[in-house]
Amino acid sequence: MTYTDLVFDLYGTLVDIHTEENDAVWEKTALYFGYYGAHYTGAALKEAFTRAMAAREARAGQSYECFPDIPFEQVMAELFRDKGVTEKADALGVNATQLFRIASTEYLRLYPGVLEALAELRSRGYRLWLLSNAQRVFTAYELRSLGLGRQLDGICLSSDYGCRKPDVRFFRVLMEERGLDVSRCLMIGNDRETDIAGAQAAGLATLYMHTNLTPPDQAAADPALAIGAAPAGNRHHEYEGSDWIRLAGLISTL
């Protein structure tokens, strides 16, 4: 077994999701703010959130992070305080963020065969890790609702660390915290830039999945780099689609 540790992206790799952060969602979130005396229109709340997030990202980028990640709930809490609502602002920020996520989510589901595939890979001796550009304030609950948490040996979410893929420091968080041998790790993700280029820069082998959530400007999987077709010893492979039962069997051949 060439690899002992499999590192997964979440959305677009294990989980199929569609969100619509449209005007109606902002209006509903603004209504929640108004319940507590923080009065915004939907458009004003969206503008204030975007401006506050950009300011925080700029400050983080100027200090040390190439790809900063700001917890959304902190920004929501700031917007409550901007309207003079200081009591329990942090808790209100959490609630507002979760409300926004729920209101904007049209569907959230595992790709077919994910749980079975993870169980099969675990039975073959692999350790399974999650490394996701995600917000703990809602992703932790989504993992629980989908039954994914119990299948994983460890979870790293970018909002906990202030940086996100493709920043090599985020990959190193997992390597260092868990004592992993980077030469025995395979990163599996659906984004050539954040997942694949970032992992390669950090020294991991990579498996690119071209799924329905891969950015539309990114190429489909190259058949010449498919598992079984790529040259022996190759540390990058590509896979078209999200058939996890089939993919688990292929991974086991590496």
Where do the language-model regions lie?
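Asp-based, Mg2+/Mn2+-dependent phosphohydrolase catalytic module
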Residues: 1-6, 17-19, 39-43, 91-94, ...
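Residue immediately C-terminal to the conserved phosphorylatable aspartate in receiver
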Residues: 10
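Basic, amphipathic juxtamembrane/active-site segments
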Residues: 21-33
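Short, flexible/disordered intra-domain loops and linkers
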Residues: 18-24, 61-68, 216-221
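Surface-exposed cleft-lining segments at the edges of enzyme active sites
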Residues: 99-108
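A metal-dependent, Asp-based hydrolase signature
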Residues: 30, 46-99
